[in-house]
Swiss-Prot record:
This is Succinate--CoA ligase [ADP-forming] subunit beta. Its cofactor is Mg(2+). The gene is sucC. Binds 1 Mg(2+) ion per subunit. Belongs to the succinate/malate CoA ligase beta subunit family. Heterotetramer of two alpha and two beta subunits. Pfam families: ATP-grasp_2, Ligase_CoA. Pathway: Carbohydrate metabolism; tricarboxylic acid cycle; succinate from succinyl-CoA (ligase route): step 1/1. The lineage of its organism: Bacteria, Pseudomonadati, Pseudomonadota, Gammaproteobacteria, Pasteurellales. SUPFAM superfamilies: Glutathione synthetase ATP-binding domain-like (SSF56059), Succinyl-CoA synthetase domains (SSF52210). Mg(2+) binds at N199, D213. InterPro entries: ATP-grasp_succ-CoA_synth-type, ATP_grasp_subdomain_1, Succ-CoA_synthase_bsu_CS, SUCC_ACL_C, Succ_CoA_ligase-like_bsu, Succinyl-CoA_synth-like. GO terms for biological process: succinyl-CoA metabolic process; tricarboxylic acid cycle. Its EC number is 6.2.1.5. It comes from the Bacteria.
Length: 388
């Protein structure tokens, strides 16, 4: 689950991390009132969306008076911001964050992720702050420094000092950075995060460190023990189809293609998407109905796929292990009868009750293309969607 920048900074403040004073605003009037409460003669006003690249897309601006604040608020509130990390529709802007500014001498990067191979939290720091960190890693890997956190002892001050030296920090900045590092390591574990980024972490013209941004992603599997963070969830940033799928215990991710995919098992779902791409097609989604799929859940999955108007064909690929293929067949028929289908449906059933499932579909009178193998299914789906 993603958090907004202003929410992340609220949490940072509780961990005594250096952040600018700021106010989250829902209306233009609130934004105008905010600059009256904040210090300084210039302020940063930022669109709050779950995506990076806001600055380049015009979603961040330095403002100096009430007129500029109101102009920015009127331009963005209730609109959608499109960045390189969003789809063509962008993300809705319902909140603006107005904060005090500071003179910037240097921009650094500091972030943390879970490294599955080492089974540890790994912190990354770079002197190339304010840039896309993936680009830094690809083009100038020597500027990216890493340190792994021992889960038994947590982040240690000496690790922070080592990173500070590599970043070229001096004097009291080293002490400041070490404190920020150890507090972030503590925060990462205590809040069950899967990703944490400060980009940029700046050195101000006064020589102090300041967290100018805050990106936090909470492990969705841990939300049951993070009620404070769960309450921060902003459903307006979610794809409505993904939210609906979650309510039916379906794993769904919307994509940009035109071949809807319904599969049981995440691995098989990814393999199905790969083979569709291999044969020249473009998946419209990732959808895993799970091992305990019921007739009702399959019907809902089918309806969610068909709600995407870009879908030109549907590929159903089921390997019956725990889930029974005849239940899948019943669910497909129920969904087709309820929603109505005007696109070709390609079905490949294998495993538990596969023969019965195929028989049910054959007797249904529906226009379904049966496939014996996964390759055949992918080829037929691409052809049905208008591909080669």
């Amino acid at each position: 689950m993603n958090l907004h920048e202003y929410q992340g900074k609220q949490i940072f403040a509780k961990y005594k991390l250096p952040v600018s004073q700021g106010i989250a605003c829902k209306t233009a009037d609130e934004a105008v009132e905010a600059i009256k409460q904040l210090k300084g003669d210039a302020w940063a006003i930022k669109c709050q969306v779950h995506a990076g690249g806001r600055g380049k897309a015009g979603g961040v601006k330095l403002v100096r008076n009430e007129a500029e604040v109101r102009e920015f608020a009127d331009k963005w509130l209730g609109k959608r911001l499109v960045t390189f990390q969003t789809d063509a529709n962008g993300q809705p802007v319902n909140t603006l964050y107005v904060e005090e500014t500071a003179g910037i001498a240097r921009e650094l990067y500091l972030g943390a992720v879970i490294d599955r191979s080492s089974q540890k939290v790994v912190f990354m720091a770079s002197s190339a702050g304010g840039m896309n960190i993936e680009e830094v890693a690809a083009k100038t890997p020597e500027l990216l420094h890493k340190v792994a956190i021992d889960p038994l002892v947590g982040g240690m001050a000496y690790q922070g000092r080592e990173l500070a030296f590599k970043l070229g920090l001096t004097g009291d900045q080293i002490k400041q950075f070490s404190f920020i590092f150890t507090q972030l390591a503590k925060l990462f574990v205590e809040k069950d995060l899967s990703l944490l980024e400060i980009n940029p972490l700046v050195v101000t013209t006064e020589g102090n460190l300041l967290c100018l941004d805050a990106k936090m992603v909470v492990d969705g599997n841990a939300l049951y023990r993070q009620p404070e963070l769960a309450a921060m969830h902003d459903p307006s940033q979610d794809d409505p189809r993904e939210a609906l799928a979650e309510s039916h215990q379906l794993n769904y991710v919307a994509l940009d293609g035109n071949i809807g995919c319904m599969v049981n098992g995440a691995g098989l779902a990814m393999g199905t998407m790969d083979i569709v791409k291999l044969h020249g097609g473009f998946p419209a989604n990732f959808l895993d109905v799970g091992g305990g799929a019921t007739k009702e859940r399959v019907a809902e999955a089918f309806k969610i796929i068909l709600s995407d108007k870009a879908v030109k064909a549907v590929l159903v690929n089921i390997f019956g292990g725990i889930v029974r293929c005849d239940l899948i067949a019943d669910g497909i028929i129920a969904a087709v009868n309820e929603v109505g289908v005007n696109v070709p449906v390609v079905v490949r059933l294998e495993g538990n009750n596969a023969e019965l499932g195929r028989e049910i579909l054959a007797k249904s009178g529906l226009n379904i293309i049966a496939a014996a193998t996964l390759t055949d299914a992918a080829v037929e789906a691409v052809k049905a969607a208008g591909g080669k």
